[in-house]
Amino acid sequence: MDKILLVNVFGEDKPGVTNAVAESLTSFGIAVLDIGQSVIHDQLNLGILVCVPAGKLFSDIQNALTKTLNEISMQVRCIPVSRNSYDNWVANQGKSRHIITLLARRIEARDLAAVTDVTLKYGLNIDKIIRLSGRVNFSKRNDL
């Protein structure tokens, strides 16, 4: 039976990381179920949810990825995902969503804590956080 694996790659962002992962996975006949990435201050966090064909071992995949990514100074973590967990995740994609937009010239940790306290109070999970503004100039941060 096919299995599901979440591959999390992280480290200093550089060209070719996604290619290195994809090339490494190619020999296992893996299908990509989902993919996403974020880069904050040149630090990459890449997640790829994959379908592993029956007969392929998670340990072989992790070893291949670790070898490939060590060559480009990246790290990898592989997490098995149960079929039940995956099915629940897929079933939730059509559920209603709430969007919160936080508008401020300057955001303090207390602002983020106040907003997330409300989400916690109502049992809501944060699916995605996106910065809509430009990056803050560190030397001018107190002017905001």
Predicted segments, located by residue:
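A conserved regulatory-domain signal marking ACT and ACT-like small-molecule sensing domains
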Residues: 1-144
